[in-house]
Curated annotation (Swiss-Prot):
It is an enzyme of class 4 (lyase). Keywords: Cytoplasm, Histidine metabolism, Lyase. This is Histidine ammonia-lyase. CDD domains: PAL-HAL. Signal peptide: none annotated. Belongs to the PAL/histidase family. GO terms for cellular component: cytoplasm. It catalyses: L-histidine = trans-urocanate + NH4(+). The lineage of its organism: Bacteria, Pseudomonadati, Pseudomonadota, Alphaproteobacteria, Hyphomicrobiales. The keyword Disulfide bond does not apply. The keyword Membrane does not apply. One of its GO terms (molecular function) is histidine ammonia-lyase activity. InterPro entries: Aromatic_Lyase, Fumarase/histidase_N, HutH, L-Aspartase-like, Phe/His_NH3-lyase_AS. It comes from Chelativorans sp. (strain BNC1).
Amino acid sequence: MTIILHPGSVLLRDLATIYWTGVPARLDPSFDAGIVKAADRIAEIAAGNAPVYGINTGFGKLASIKIDSADVAALQRNLVLSHCCGVGEALPENVVRLMMALKLVSLGRGASGVRLELVRLIEAMLARGVIPVIPEKGSVGASGDLAPLAHMAAVMMGHGEAFFGGERLNGATALLKAGLQPVELAAKEGLALINGTQTSTALALAGLFRAHRAAQSALITGAMSTDAAMGSSAPFHPEIHTLRGHRGQIDTAEALRALLENSPIRQSHIEGDERVQDPYCIRCQPQVDGACLDLLRSVARTLEIEANAVTDNPLVLSDNSVVAGGNFHAEPVAFAADQIVLAICEIGAIAQRRIALLVDPALSYGLPAFLAKKPGLNSGLMIAEVTSAALMSENKQMSHPASVDSTPTSANQEDHVSMACHGARRLLPMTENLFAIIGIEALCAAQGVELRAPLATSPELTKAIAAIRNVVPSLEEDRYMANDLKAATVLIASGSLNESVSSGILPALEV
């Protein structure tokens, strides 16, 4: 399977498929003519004497220096290699694959002026599994993601490092083993490759896809916690939510109702329950998780636009003029990443409060302390709850907005930057923490429901508990817990818990 990209109209679902599965991507051939036309225009300028930024001039603060036409190729080579200044660990390969696909989309719009040869090489690298090693740190998100994308371009030139066949190799060797040849860059091509927001956008999209998967799982575990605590489903009544009108809240309440439908536990306490209202972590799930869903959907629209954007500089416009601008500034991506952070924190915060409720006999309506079958002799899920609190707090500490932390760079020529790249990169560890929090809630909620026997939960939640028990058995007595938490985290991160319930129940990202 190969994803066929139509620059300008690429859909989030296709980008999600590239991220989750690693499937290759290539441009629809109908875009070749536009790419060639822009490349011809750049070649025409490079052969002339008029100075045009990025083609026959220096870069950044050095833009006023005219470069001789004989040195145009060397200019691009020097640009790429000098900008390979990334530090830190390598970005995950699935993020880099997505980044490369996004670069294809940008180049495919026919405004960058690169030869078709470069596009074909990126496509071939994706198809054959030559994935550049991209150090995770070094971009301030304007002028684009220079350092990370330079590491990609370097591999295309036979420099740098790449993953291929499970090995980390130098770029030239990786290309050779894949049956590919390095490219010699022509006018503007180095700049077109490294000047763009594709690294930040790939990281933000990865964070978005992961946060949405976690949000869906949190509806399952939240519904399960509701039944485990013998909470009321009355606050999920549809009219309550239509009276407020927020789509995410309405969709979340609908999902909770579907998950809890026909629960014998719920039926057992509809009448005669002395409790008037549940705590907010049970009762206000539609309001909190629904607001998070609305936020993620809003961010999804922003990132879908950015994924289809041309973000290098200068650009070949429709009248064949070449004009310098600032599309490389990743402020929209930085804002999007900062918003995703809010959803991650809040989904985790309310889930953690449900965990705390379930392990507290003063709040759990008859469940044993820490969900242990013999409390005292056994500590049960006591420290699992503490771990969830630690992860929740760690996420809060990472939630400071990155976009407000601009600093001048490059001799004050690039005097306002977005910080989008590390703002988006933190979404990966934050969502990993969130997967673990929701995994812990899954263990607690499943244990709580089982302790209500002989009463059973709903058919949908019964299927979800079966998925949990497929990887973690019931807690009969204290045991080594780290493996249980790891397995539960993987269950959430892989999407397996979401797949256990009927299709169509969990709200989609795209509406």
